[in-house]
């Protein structure tokens, strides 16, 4: 995993006919990881979408993470899965997907949840929401200092929740290795998505000491 933009899809913003082209736009702009998050569609459609996204992400040499569904991740040979607190256990997901899989864990605003996720083998720790979010308006609010404290786990730290180009810099400075962005990236046409992704990459290039230009951008 590299520091940078973590693009998270949303079926309310991206109808099926736009999903792949929008993700490809984010990848062209420099997204370093993509999460497929779609729970409303029937399983056959989700399977097709996930397979198409795996192909797009593999072409860009960027990991595709499946939200909350280790079985789907295994079926499409995705790079890994992101788990919420009410989803499959880390141990179960690891057993299904193997040691090489990337498994991320939602930690909300809790260092204790992060500690448990770290002990159970999470590959990255996700905190938030940090700002008002239409995607998860009821998620507990997190203070930015939790990003700094979470550095002690020596795992990549991800921030999520209401993130835009106007507020992302402060999260990177506080310790975020990745910014998981939904509406602040995908609410617009493909040209706008690509431009926003490039601007997020610029934030990391300026403010994150370990940022490198993704291979597909060189």
Sequence positions of predicted segments:
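Conserved N-terminal beta1-alpha1 strand-loop-helix module at the mouth
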Residues: 1-90, 95-123, 139, 149, ...
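Internal alpha/beta core interface subdomains
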Residues: 177-178
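Feature marks short, surface-exposed loop/turn motifs that line or immediately flank catalytic pockets
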Residues: 40, 131-134
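Phosphate-binding beta-alpha-beta segment of Rossmann-like dinucleotide-binding domains, i.e.
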Residues: 127, 134-137
């Amino acid at each position: 995993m590299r520091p940078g933009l973590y693009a998270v899809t949303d079926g309310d913003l991206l109808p099926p006919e736009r999903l792949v082209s929008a993700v490809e736009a984010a990848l062209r702009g420099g997204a370093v990881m993509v999460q497929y998050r779609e729970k409303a569609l029937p399983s056959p459609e989700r399977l097709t979408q996930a397979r198409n996204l795996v192909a797009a992400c593999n072409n860009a040499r960027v990991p595709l993470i499946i939200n909350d569904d280790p079985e789907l991740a295994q079926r499409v040979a995705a790079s890994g899965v992101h788990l919420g607190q009410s989803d499959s256990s880390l141990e179960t997901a690891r057993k299904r997907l193997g040691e090489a899989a990337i498994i991320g864990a939602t930690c909300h605003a809790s260092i204790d949840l992060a500690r448990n996720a770290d002990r159970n083998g999470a590959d990255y720790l996700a905190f938030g929401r940090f700002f008002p979010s239409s995607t998860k308006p009821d998620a507990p609010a997190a203070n930015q200092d939790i990003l700094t404290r979470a550095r002690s786990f020596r795992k990549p730290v991800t921030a999520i929740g209401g993130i835009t180009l106007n507020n992302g810099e402060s999260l990177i400075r506080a310790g975020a290795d990745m910014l998981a962005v939904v509406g602040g990236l995908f609410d617009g046409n493909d040209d706008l998505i690509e431009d926003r992704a490039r601007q997020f990459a610029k934030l990391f290039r300026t403010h994150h000491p370990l940022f490198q230009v993704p291979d597909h951008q060189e």
